[in-house]
Regions:
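Metal-dependent polysaccharide deacetylase catalytic core of the NodB/CE4 family, i.e.
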Residues: 40-43, 53-55, 59-199
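N-terminal pre-catalytic segment of deacetylase/amide-hydrolase enzymes
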Residues: 1-46, 51-61, 65, 178
Length: 199
């Protein structure tokens, strides 16, 4: 979604109206969350977590300190290599969601291939003792209508974002103050914020 001044909600390009038809969303657009001055102020913190480099636990610590919850879209690598973190996410009230097992472009896959990929991640989390929430985020944000329909057929809702902070490149990060200012400048009621616990 494009940045919208005045902290109003952005709107997706009309070509992507099928997102909603496929059970997907990128913003909380319920009436109480559509106005910048609405009574309810809400943002959703979502994290694409593929691997651990020492920051996932720090993010969990910060969320605990702030008494905040998030949704973690995890990959098979994190679930298999760090089952303790998957268990901690669930134990501390966060959603453990499906980001696929191997983080590959799924846009042209068959429905059976998609179902197998979702199940593979579910199984990895289940081995860690955690059931995944029925929310999916496509790897790299790449999607097609056929992918979203296949995901919906497996009982999932696809979660996109209304603001994605470019934090995946560890070598190109601004100062904490500049990062905070950028995020606050782009906040809007009902925002779904995409973050990565790698930087």
């Amino acid at each position: 979604c494009a940045h919208v001044r005045g902290h109003m909600q952005p709107r997706a390009d009309g070509r992507f109206a099928f997102i909603r038809d496929c059970g997907g969303f990128y913003i909380d657009d319920r009436p109480e969350h559509t106005a910048a001055d609405g009574a309810d102020k809400v943002v959703y913190l979502t994290f694409d977590a593929g691997y651990e480099n020492g920051n996932v636990a720090r993010v969990l610590d910060a969320l605990a300190q702030a008494d905040a919850a998030g949704a973690f879209f995890v990959l098979g690598n994190l679930a298999r290599q760090n089952p303790d973190l998957i268990r901690r996410m669930a134990a501390e009230g966060h959603l453990v969601c499906n980001h696929s097992y191997a983080h590959r472009d799924m846009t042209s896959w068959s429905a059976d291939e998609i179902a197998a990929e979702l199940t593979r991640l579910e199984d990895a989390c289940r081995e860690a003792g955690v059931e995944t929430a029925k929310f999916f985020r496509p790897p790299e944000g790449r999607f097609s209508e056929s992918l979203l329909r296949a995901v919906m057929a497996q009982g999932y809702r696809t979660v996109f974002w209304s603001f994605g902070y470019a934090d995946w490149d560890n070598d190109r990060q601004p100062s904490p103050a500049a990062a905070k200012a950028k995020i606050l400048d782009n906040l809007h009621n009902g925002a779904v914020i995409l973050l990565h616990p790698t930087s």
